[in-house]
């Protein structure tokens, strides 16, 4: 039996050791780390692409210092940008472009770019994290910047008990403390074994260096005064020497405590620039911000199916994301008034399956091929609160008045087939290449204009034309190719080309329109952005990379220069949060690297990482600095 406990009180966030370069060998056994995110189960040293593996010890070290998962990744992965201290990873990217996040190979990204993929699991339940930097054609849409695969802890044959207790405080106030407690039990026999875990985290108030309480984020929603519960179970059945069946199920709920909110001042003074907002423990709202998710993943493995390795997965995920109540302004400057206060809720149902074969038809040739199929359904609503009660309570008493649609509902169906190859010309040179064909079908529902829905709900109109829905599809062929040179047993250098593809957020692109003056209470639609007349253009990215890595006994380094070019870009309209496409080409290039050194005869390591990046947009014949 193994019991591990932790009690940590820190007046400030402290790094106990420098971040490391994930090694190509496991720290405890010396065995190669297999990167399952490659789909071909290659070791790091066999991959012609920048690859990082963050092991459990590094994750635990960072988490024990009080860091969230997204902060851990930003700390340890050179090409990943830093996000705010909130619930979402909004604004985070890899090498300046979008990334895919998966748990045990199940993607958490949706067609709706909701940015809560890293609000998905407690670090206590993570075994290791695999990261592939740059466009990954093998996984298709959305992976133009890179891929993160979170591999969960699994049970062992022997009985094990793991317990973790922790807390941190800045000693600024009685509410300035976070606590966490987690426990897991695993065991079984050589034919069947499993693991069951429960992890709970409570967040208190947050304070700055001068002892002032940090205001709760009412845009992407903050973690102050919230609770997180992650319940996860997994089981493995060894059918015979070659076959196994593995089931993983998770319930995840990260939600505000329902009592703390923002005091907006008398008559919304803080919103109108006539006062200052502050946190309050008197919130009474019919909608609480948070993330709730259920996920099930069933995997079948066969290491000898007609001489091939087979991995087949079937999975399901549903999630509900709610946001903090947000006031909207009406009137004209300088006589603005708060016209409404509301909060959105977005629901996603997602299921799919994938089959991957690995075969070795020749001694020097490895083929990886298979197919993916996924279906996603999305809906969103906006809850409006009683404005008079909210006004009288400084925005703290929020009783439901009515609901409207927030974005048009849609479904997305994706089917893909892929082939990847790796050929050893000789012990020095390995060539790799692959292709993925992906078919995507989007179906969008009819949607009445957002403002017109409000007017109808408030009795100021009787009806309005709907922006018509419809459907469209995309066919994409994505390629990748690379060459790996094994300079020595501990050094490799590589050149890689890979393509990525992404379809901008269709919920924000479609469903908007221009309406005429009402006629007998009915708003006529004059023009609109709809799927039939305006087919959103996908963005294709070509990515190039030149890299080098060294994996020694004490020193481990990895360095890469990268360049990516997209044929178009998109931006966000800050007024209504819709998106619009621009035909301007965008290029991003830079250099990233990391080094880690283990000091002999000690448990200490020192290291550093860096990322120098530049983004440019082409306007006419000139390249200009981008965002």
Q: Could you tell me what each predicted segment is?
A:
Residues 121-164:
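A beta-strand signature from Gram-negative outer-membrane beta-barrel systems
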Residues 106-133, 183, 233:
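Short acidic/polar hinge/loop motifs at secondary-structure boundaries
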Residues 299-303, 307-327, 486, 492-498, ...:
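Membrane-embedded beta-barrel scaffold of Gram-negative outer-membrane proteins
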Residues 238, 242-252, 287-453, 484-486, ...:
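Face-selective signature of the C-terminal outer-membrane beta-barrel domain
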Residues 31-64:
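N-terminal periplasmic "start-of-domain" segments of outer-membrane beta-barrel proteins
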Residues 164, 424-431, 440, 551-570, ...:
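Gram-negative outer-membrane beta-barrel transporters
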Residues 36, 70-107, 127:
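Extracytoplasmic beta-strand/coil segments of soluble accessory domains associated
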Residues 174-203, 212-260, 292-303, 361, ...:
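Transmembrane beta-barrel wall of Gram-negative outer-membrane proteins
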């Amino acid at each position: 039996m193994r019991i591990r406990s932790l009690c940590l009180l820190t007046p400030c966030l402290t790094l106990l050791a420098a971040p490391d370069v994930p090694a190509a060998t496991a720290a405890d056994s010396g065995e190669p780390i297999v990167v399952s995110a490659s789909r071909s189960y290659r070791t790091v040293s066999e991959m012609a692409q920048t690859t990082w593996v963050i092991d459990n010890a590094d994750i635990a070290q960072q988490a024990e210092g009080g860091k969230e998962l997204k902060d851990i990744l930003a700390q340890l992965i050179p090409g990943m940008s830093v996000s705010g201290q909130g619930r979402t990873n909004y604004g985070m990217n890899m090498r300046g472009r979008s990334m895919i996040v998966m748990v045990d190979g199940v993607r958490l990204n949706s067609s709706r770019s909701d940015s809560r993929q890293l609000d998905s699991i407690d670090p206590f339940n993570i075994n290791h994290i695999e990261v592939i930097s740059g466009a990954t054609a093998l996984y298709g849409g959305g992976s133009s910047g890179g891929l993160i695969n979170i591999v969960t802890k699994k049970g062992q044959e022997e009985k094990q008990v793991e317990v973790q207790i922790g807390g941190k405080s800045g000693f600024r106030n009685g509410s300035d403390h976070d606590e966490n407690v987690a426990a897991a039990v695993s065991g079984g026999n050589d034919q069947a074994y499993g693991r069951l875990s429960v992890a709970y985290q409570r967040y208190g108030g947050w304070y700055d260096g001068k002892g002032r309480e940090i205001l709760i984020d009412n845009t992407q929603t903050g973690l102050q005064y919230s609770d997180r519960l992650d319940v996860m179970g997994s089981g493995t059945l060894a059918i015979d020497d070659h076959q196994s069946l593995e089931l993983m199920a998770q319930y995840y709920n990260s939600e505000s405590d329902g009592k703390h909110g923002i005091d907006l001042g008398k008559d919304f003074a803080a919103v109108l620039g006539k006062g200052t907002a502050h946190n309050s423990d008197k919130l009474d709202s019919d909608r609480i911000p948070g993330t709730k998710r259920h996920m099930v993943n069933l995997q079948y493995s066969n290491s000898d199916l007609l001489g091939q390795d087979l991995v087949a997965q079937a999975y399901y995920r549903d999630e509900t994301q709610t946001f903090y109540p947000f006031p909207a302004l009406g009137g004209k400057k300088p006589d603005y008034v708060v016209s409404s206060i509301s909060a959105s809720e977005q629901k996603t149902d997602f299921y799919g399956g994938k089959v991957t074969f690995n075969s070795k038809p020749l001694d020097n040739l490895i083929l990886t091929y298979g197919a993916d199929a996924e279906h996603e359904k999305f809906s969103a609503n906006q809850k409006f609160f009683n404005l008079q009660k909210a006004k009288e309570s400084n925005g703290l008493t929020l009783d439901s008045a009515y609901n409207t649609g927030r974005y048009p509902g849609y479904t997305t169906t994706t089917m893909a087939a892929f082939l990847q190859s790796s050929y050893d010309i000789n012990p020095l040179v390995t060539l790799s290449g692959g292709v993925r064909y992906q078919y995507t079908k989007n179906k969008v529902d009819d949607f009445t204009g957002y403002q017109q829905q409000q007017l109808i709900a408030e009795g100021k109109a009787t009806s309005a034309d709907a922006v018509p829905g419809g459907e469209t599809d995309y066919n994409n062929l994505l390629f990748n190719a690379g060459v790996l040179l094994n300079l020595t047993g501990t050094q490799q250098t590589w050149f890689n080309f890979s393509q990525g593809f992404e379809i901008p957020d269709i919920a924000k692109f479609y469903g908007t329109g221009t309406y005429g003056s009402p006629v007998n209470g009915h708003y006529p639609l004059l023009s609109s952005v709809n799927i039939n007349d305006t087919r959103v253009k996908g963005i294709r990215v070509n990515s190039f990379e030149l890299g080098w890595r060294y994996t020694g006994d004490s020193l481990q380094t990895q360095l890469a220069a990268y360049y990516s070019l997209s044929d178009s870009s998109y931006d966000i309209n800050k007024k209504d949060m819709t998106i619009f496409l621009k035909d301007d080409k965008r290029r991003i290039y830079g250099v990233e690297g990391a080094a880690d050194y283990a000091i002999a005869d000690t448990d200490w390591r020192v290291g550093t990482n860096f990322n120098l990046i530049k983004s440019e947009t082409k306007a006419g014949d000139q390249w200009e600095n981008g965002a």
